[in-house]
């Protein structure tokens, strides 16, 4: 499939969640035509919303979604990618490209489909970006990095969206996605903890936002090791001990784990601080 050379390009979306709808909407904004949306059912709210946004028809069966489409986006939960894609085999056009959007799963999830239809291309495309809604996602996609796997057409598709594609080995996808989860989901959970601890101290959580933004900017400018500041980086065990004493047991446990990561990042050889951080939770 020649993604950038076709004047009439049609796509279908299977799995109208936030990521799938965002990617499909971005392509429609770039001249693609959406011809079909398949979800849990044609009447499901997510299916209706995606179809209305994309100007596409709602199909009852996944098996019918590929008809007339140059590109099929599979954005279902990971556990059903293989079977969902395989169901497309009877309707796919010769030369069509089928991509899934999973971060953790390799292109191999589409092997069953490719075995049945060797005349179509299959690949994986995972934008390394948080896409909480199509409206927000459309603003965030351009310039974001994107993990791709498959034929050159997958990379061309990513570039057409303004993404910055990179390739990773199939065996490294789970590790890659774990890194993305730590950087996004776990960071959000950590910031939620920081907000809760600040609130307990009578500090408005929004007061932390300039510090959070500055920390991310410092990592961008300097790298993690040089951006690290604070008591662990200074070897200030007395302050760390006061922090641990002030925190509830669950918060202290998280603090110890992350402080050990900070100590390793700092490169400090500080047995006393290590012993403090390895101590029993209160």
Where in this protein do the model-derived segments appear?
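Internal alpha-helical scaffold of NAD(P)-dependent oxidoreductase catalytic cores
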Residues: 6, 49-53, 113-121, 134-221
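Hydrophobic Val/Ile/Leu positions in short beta-strands of Rossmann-like dinucleotide-binding domains
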Residues: 11-13, 74, 148
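Interdomain hinge/lid region at the active-site interface
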Residues: 217-275, 280-282
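NAD(P)+-binding Rossmann beta1-loop-alpha1 motif at the extreme N-terminus of oxidoreductases
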Residues: 1-61
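Short, hydrophobic beta-strand segments that form beta-sheet elements in well-ordered domains
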Residues: 35-39, 98-100, 145-149, 262
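Short, well-ordered alpha-helices that flank and scaffold nucleotide-derived cofactor binding pockets
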Residues: 21, 25-29, 52, 86-90, ...
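Short, charged/polar "capping" segments at the starts of alpha-helices
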Residues: 42-48, 106-109, 153-154
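Rossmann-like NAD(P)(H) cofactor-binding subdomain of soluble oxidoreductases
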Residues: 53-137
């Amino acid at each position: 499939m020649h993604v950038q050379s076709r004047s009439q390009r049609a796509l279908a979306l299977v799995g109208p969640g936030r990521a799938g709808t965002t990617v499909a909407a971005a392509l429609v904004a770039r001249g693609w035509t959406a011809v079909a949306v398949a979800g849990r059912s044609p009447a499901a709210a997510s299916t209706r919303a995606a179809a209305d946004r994309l100007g596409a028809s709602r199909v009852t069966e996944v098996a019918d979604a590929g008809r007339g489409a140059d590109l099929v986006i599979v954005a279902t939960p990971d556990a059903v990618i293989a079977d969902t894609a395989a169901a497309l085999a009877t309707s796919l056009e010769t030369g069509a490209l089928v991509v899934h959007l999973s971060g953790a799963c390799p292109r191999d999830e589409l092997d069953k489909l490719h075995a049945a239809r060797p005349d179509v291309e299959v690949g994986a495309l995972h934008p390394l970006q948080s896409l909480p809604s199509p409206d927000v996602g459309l603003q965030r996609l351009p310039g974001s990095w994107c993990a791709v796997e498959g034929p050159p057409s997958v990379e061309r598709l990513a570039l057409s969206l303004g993404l910055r594609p990179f390739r990773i080995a199939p065996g490294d996808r789970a590790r890659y996605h774990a890194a993305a989860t730590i950087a996004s989901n776990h960071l959000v959970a950590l910031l939620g903890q920081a907000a809760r601890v600040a609130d307990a101290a009578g500090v408005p959580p929004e007061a932390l936002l300039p510090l959070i933004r500055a920390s991310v900017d410092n990592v961008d400018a300097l790298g993690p090791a040089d951006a690290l500041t604070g008591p662990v980086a200074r070897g200030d065990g007395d302050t760390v001990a006061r922090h641990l004493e002030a925190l509830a047991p669950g918060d202290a446990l998280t603090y110890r784990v992350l402080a050990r990561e900070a100590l390793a990042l700092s490169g400090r050889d500080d047995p006393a601080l290590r012993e403090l951080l390895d101590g029993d939770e209160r």
